[in-house]
Regions:
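Detector for Asparagine
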Residues: 14, 74, 118, 141, ...
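Generic low-polarity alpha-helical segments
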Residues: 17, 21, 39, 45-53, ...
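Hydrophobic alpha-helical bundle signature of multipass membrane enzymes
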Residues: 1-85, 91-132
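Functional transmembrane or membrane-interface alpha-helices that line membrane-embedded catalytic
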Residues: 109-118, 147-175
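Primarily interfacial, aromatic-capped hydrophobic alpha-helices that serve as membrane anchors
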Residues: 161-223
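Generic recognition of cysteine residues
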Residues: 8, 46, 66, 84, ...
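Alpha-helical transmembrane segments that form the membrane-embedded catalytic/substrate-binding core
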Residues: 92-96, 130-163
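Charged/polar, low-hydrophobicity segments characteristic of intrinsically disordered regions
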Residues: 52-58, 133-147, 183-191
């Protein structure tokens, strides 16, 4: 648990609301609302699909004991470490930046606008994604499961290559993790993502390889 990342973690809701507000200001209430509804329908789809997994398993981790502080207490009371595989935090931030990447192009935003806002949305998506481990205290398995789910249910927005890029950028600028540990973390996430992608390629239900993995997984239990 790394309290310094709490503010970033708590930006999760504001992260996907800010672009909605921007659409309202740019296009007006009528058109801006249509674009916002389009995004919210994707959100709804993601939550419905993730719910199907959570009826099977709510979490794969035990939260380790952390130094007591108000920040720790507030986060752990308000946000239990459930909804783990796939992580909705990862799903939503990746959906957000990929949706608006598509929308900025479709709605004829200028090249400068697209470059600036795509860069900002992506960088914050990566930062919030990292806090899933720093603050939420999921296992690394929640990340590849989320990326895999998105490639299956929103392939028009989120591709396997986008998932690989996201994985490669995780913890790139972190100073509290050794280079060796960064490599090990990212390599494992990449391995799990590719495994799920390959095993799910011929399945009608994207959940099949995730459930297969869950059935064989034994979580680490802190002593």
């Amino acid at each position: 648990f790394t309290p310094v990342h709490i503010d970033c973690y708590l930006d999760f809701i504001n992260y996907w609301i800010r672009p909605i507000v921007m659409m309202q200001k740019r296009f007006g209430i009528k058109q801006g609302s249509k674009l916002s509804i389009e995004f919210l329908r994707y959100i709804k789809r993601c939550y419905k699909e993730a719910y199907k997994m959570y009826t099977y398993s709510m979490t794969t981790t035990y939260r380790p004991k952390c130094p007591e502080s108000r920040a720790v207490t507030n986060v752990q009371r308000a946000d239990p470490h459930y909804l783990c595989v796939p992580s909705l935090h990862i799903v939503v931030v990746c959906l957000c930046y990929s949706f608006y990447r598509m929308l900025f192009k479709r709605e004829s935003f200028t090249q400068q606008e697209r470059e600036q806002w795509n860069s900002e949305l992506y960088a914050q998506a990566v930062a919030i994604g990292e806090t899933v481990l720093y603050v939420k205290q999921h296992s690394v398995n929640c990340i590849p499961a989320a990326l895999y789910m998105l490639t299956k249910i929103t392939p028009e927005l989120f591709t396997p290559q986008m998932a690989v890029n996201f994985i490669n950028d995780l913890f790139k600028n972190s100073t509290d993790i050794t280079d060796a540990d960064k490599k090990e973390i990212n390599s494992y996430i990449q391995f799990m993502f590719e495994r799920l992608l390959l095993e799910g390629a011929l399945e009608d239900d994207w959940r099949v390889p995730v459930i297969r993995w869950l059935d064989s997984y034994k979580p680490y239990e802190p002593q």
